[in-house]
Amino acid sequence: GPMFGLFLHDGGVSFATIFCYALGSCMLGFLSASLVKTPYKPPVKREPISLDRFILLKGMPAGLSLLLLSIPYGMTTNYVAMYAREIGIHTQTGFFFTFMAIGMAISRIFSGKLVDRGKITQVIAAGLYLVVVSFFLLASCVYLIQWNDTACTILFFGIALLMGIGFGIMFPAFNTLFVNLAPNNQRGTATSTYLTSWDVGIGIGMLTGGYIAEICSFDKAYLFGACLTVVSAVYFKLKVTPHYHKNKLR
């Protein structure tokens, strides 16, 4: 989505037309979803509404780690094109998301097999290390481009590939971690907690990234995001991993 939008914008397409494409995509998605047929399930008696109906309480530590991780991701999806222009990278920034998608595709080759073998926390830790490195490199591009703009441009897209591999490794592993902490009747709650943590973090990233860039610059916003990934990695190692191994149900 970001790649296609940036290509249209760089090609001189107006914002109104770009939003029309986005609206058309939403309508196609809604139409496709409405055609899905599922077997009828009779209503079941629900227990009184409580917090654990919506949030997996045992998944809160992992949710906090994921939220911290998704803040810089939200900054990237919304501001990386403006950051590239700010520091002087003038190539098609839509390719950043192309390489990011390639990295995610590469990660699927091996990450799923490792998760199936039970190496969930190890896979997430490996992805965290890659993401930490990639965000610090992204923040340093503002200095590297003064040394060699060609090398910095190559590194810029290399960062996207590395970031895609890191996040691609972690996405399915985090989802499995949440599900493994939940009893069978709360698997939906586990997935909801996973997605809520991710979406809230992206929203915070959009707000904080824009605010920091307004008062300082985008490289400072990404440096802040890189520091958050370090906090997330340390918290995952010290808190989430032992909590998961103590409370996992499968």
Language model segments and positions:
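Juxtamembrane intracellular "pre-TM" segments in multi-pass secondary transporters
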Residues: 36-66
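Helix-loop boundary and gating motifs at the non-cytosolic
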Residues: 59-66, 70-89, 96
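Loop-to-transmembrane helix entry/capping segments in MFS-fold secondary transporters
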Residues: 90-91, 184-194
